[in-house]
């Protein structure tokens, strides 16, 4: 069987090569023809000659300086015995200076029918034997005929061939046929098989997909009872949570052909190519059913129709219409399941989400602590670990990270250990990798003493407010070493896997965010641009409290959608604002009030603990980095220690670094 398949593939490749040769021609033959034509044109160039007058020719003839003559209908040409000097008065081209002529000459034959006869007699008298009459030259007439007749025929033939080739392309052949072919990649049985055992931390999602696997294995079990399997499964969730891996695991468990394609690959520069590719993909999948079609990033082609600025007839919408038609056209006996993945289900067209197309929606969220520990176990299978590596502790300190983040963290730890010529990966390597991913790599640069001191006070303000506020996040580490684009970082350990927060906790979060700015005001009586990122995040939280979560007594329990939430410009243009200008003013006033109150409380708390603020700042300037244990030695146990609330996840707040300060991914995910 293997030999047969190899021979078949060889025959197929040979046919493809032959067909390619027929379409495009053999490059060697084309190059040879071009070379021969170029050589013919080069070697057929006439020998250069000097243009003279008939009188000068007559004078040279009398001086017996003519070696050969060729008499034509239009011109007389020949060669001199010696190269003469032609006076300016005799120059046929109007040259004002005497010049030495070339060996060969030519001049226009004078009018008169008997000139040729008379010239031939003169040549015979002077005993010049090398002369002749040249035959008529019809080259010019032939060229004119080719230009007048041949060129229009060539253009007509070219247009005819293009029309014929375009028709072949529409039927699936020709040199453009590759554009209409589906770009989907098929994963064969020889590829690495992914099963549910390779997917960790998503037990609930795997249970939802197990029914799909059962249908692909034994479809008659469901069809016998009149049941129909979902035609489509939509996996939605943040990037890196394992949506593609889950789709491949479904195919691996069911042992069926798996076609994978990205949504953006359907769209090309030619109109209709996307729809043609969709038809080809579904046709191939139906021929090999039962099978799975996986469309990654389906929001690239499945966005809501009519929401953009391009109208309703662009290439993307034609492709979407074809997908909708193909998913409706499945017969009951065709075991073809479409699995799609997106992290923006809110922008998809409603027709794509209705029952009968994507019947089942599966949310693939970030893993819990138990799930993260299982993911760590999967990714450290081939990594030699030290005895001090505690996967449970790593899982507890990486809340909010996805499977892709954890994989990256394990890889960074292995690279760091290899850089130190270690034989195993130790816990310190994982701590380094976690800090690098969450806070950024350390920057080797020397700060001015004034900047370093201001950064220390800023970070101390964040640390101290979180240290004394109940319900805030546990301080894990604070540093004034520049990392990434930040001059300093305060790293927190919030409560584990929390999905909701109270108004009081949000207010405390605002106080902590504004703590760095408040510390600068207390010490320097002014603030710097380093608090830009803190203000952005605090403003976002306060605005959500007012417009989304009904936490403003003045606005009340109402949800207002603001324009910055629209995923793209077209959708915002087509929608109208749901509230008046007066309501917008009230929203702005309430947001400002909440932030002002948080700022005042942060400043009041820091003034009450001014001594601890100075202590933390002094130690930061001395050590540059303090962890939770060292902070406890300096200022006593935090409120979290006293209340026994010590479980959590890692988050960060960036310190001043100017307008370019950034927010870490982990922090931004939690704040949103």
Curated annotation (Swiss-Prot):
Q: Which InterPro entries is this protein grouped with?
A: AAA+_ATPase, AAA_lid_3, ATPase_AAA_core, ATPase_AAA_CS, FtsH, P-loop_NTPase, Pept_M41_FtsH_extracell, Peptidase_M41
Q: Where does ATP bind?
A: 237-244
Q: Which Pfam families match?
A: AAA (PF00004), AAA_lid_3 (PF17862), FtsH_ext (PF06480), Peptidase_M41 (PF01434)
Q: Does the keyword Zinc apply?
A: yes
How many cofactor units bind, and how? Answer: Binds 1 zinc ion per subunit.
Molecular function terms, GO-annotated: ATP binding; ATP hydrolysis activity; ATP-dependent peptidase activity; metalloendopeptidase activity; zinc ion binding
Instruction: Detail which positions bind Zn(2+).
Output: 458, 462, 534
Question: Which cellular compartments is it found in?
Answer: Cell inner membrane
Amino acid composition bias (Polar residues), ranges on this chain: 662-672
- Mapped to this chain, the residue ranges on the Cytoplasmic side of the membrane are 1-23, 163-672
Q: Where is this region: Disordered?
A: 1-22, 642-672
Q: Which cofactor does it need?
A: Zn(2+)
> NCBIfam families recorded for this chain?
FtsH_fam (TIGR01241)
- Record's family? In the central section; belongs to the AAA ATPase family. In the C-terminal section; belongs to the peptidase M41 family.
How it assembles, according to the record, is:
Homohexamer.
The protein in question is named: ATP-dependent zinc metalloprotease FtsH 1
